[in-house]
């Protein structure tokens, strides 16, 4: 069990770092393409995003990754490609419209804001947000969805 936990931790760490590198590259391309909007928009947006109370941020993150993992589960269960597409879009749109927090989406948002508004983003506040949201995402996906699904299929 300890070995499996270490393997999961290693996969999560590599995935997290890989996602950050991908967000960094895409944010640079996004900014260089001029597709990122204005610096004024990002300055206000980031200020609001980083001022969300920690408890609220945590629960938004739990709900967010519940939706993300639900999208993955629906995608695996649907046999028809069109049905998969619409189920995934519906689940993802649910968390986006609700304004929930996802650590990978926040990585891209924070990097883009840092590139557009140099000095306009607090590294401490961004790191605090990332820790809270990452923990919430792990609970939302792992405890609220993956674990119950695993328990339901354990006898099979």
Regions found by a protein language model. Give the residues of each.
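C-terminal transmembrane helix-loop-helix hairpin of multi-pass membrane proteins
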Residues: 95-150, 154-155
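Alpha-helical transmembrane segments in multipass membrane proteins, preferentially the mid-helix core
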Residues: 66-77
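Short, small-residue-biased leader/transition segments that mark boundaries at the very start
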Residues: 1-2
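Membrane-interface interhelical connector segments
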Residues: 32-57
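Alpha-helical transmembrane segments and their lipid-water interface positions
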Residues: 22-30, 68, 105, 140-145
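Internal alpha-helical transmembrane segments of multi-pass membrane proteins
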Residues: 79-94
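Transmembrane helix-loop junctions in multipass membrane proteins, especially transporters and channels
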Residues: 31-39, 77-81, 118, 149, ...
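Alpha-helical transmembrane segments of multi-pass membrane proteins
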Residues: 10-18, 22, 132, 136
């Amino acid at each position: 069990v300890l070995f499996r936990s270490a393997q999961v931790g290693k996969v999560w760490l590599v995935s997290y770092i890989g996602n950050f590198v991908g967000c960094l590259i895409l944010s640079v391309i996004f900014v260089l393409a001029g597709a990122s909007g204005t610096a004024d928009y990002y300055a206000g947006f980031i200020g609001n995003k980083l001022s969300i109370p920690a408890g609220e941020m945590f629960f938004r993150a739990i709900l967010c990754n519940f939706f993300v993992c639900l999208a993955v589960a629906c995608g695996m269960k649907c046999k028809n490609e069109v049905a998969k597409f619409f189920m995934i879009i519906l689940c993802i749109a649910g968390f986006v419209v609700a304004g929930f927090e996802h650590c990978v989406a926040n990585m891209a948002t924070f990097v883009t804001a840092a590139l557009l508004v140099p000095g306009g983003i607090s590294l401490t506040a961004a790191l605090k947000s990332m820790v809270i949201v990452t923990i919430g995402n792990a609970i939302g996906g792992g405890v609220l969805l993956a674990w119950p699904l695993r328990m339901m299929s354990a006898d099979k």
